[in-house]
């Protein structure tokens, strides 16, 4: 049996915010991208245990989560995210919040066919900025109101 070779370069996607007119390509292996991690934050099951040990499972609705985008601190992608963040903060500080959670992200890994769509995306905060002898990677953390993965 032969395995399938993984390549981050087979990741293709896009980040868009139609309110502010931003389109940022997300392509693995390009533009200083170091990695992407998707994390669901809603537990889908809760269990209540009665005094006699009877377990009552409950299904919990929700599809929200987080997305970490790790980039080189001098990358084009970092600059694009920083520009979008600053634009949205400036608008929000002027009471224009229409664009704050209007970002959408979709990407696919061509090798295995997995597709992820995130909507209602907003920035958690500006990432920490390291200053060291050598350039570093920084991680942008975004929150998504809805994540679908196929």
Region locations from a protein language model:
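Short, acidic/charged, Gly/Pro-enriched secondary-structure junctions
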Residues: 83-117
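Short, conserved charged micro-motifs
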Residues: 76-82
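Solvent-exposed edge beta-strands and adjacent loop segments
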Residues: 1-76, 113-141, 149
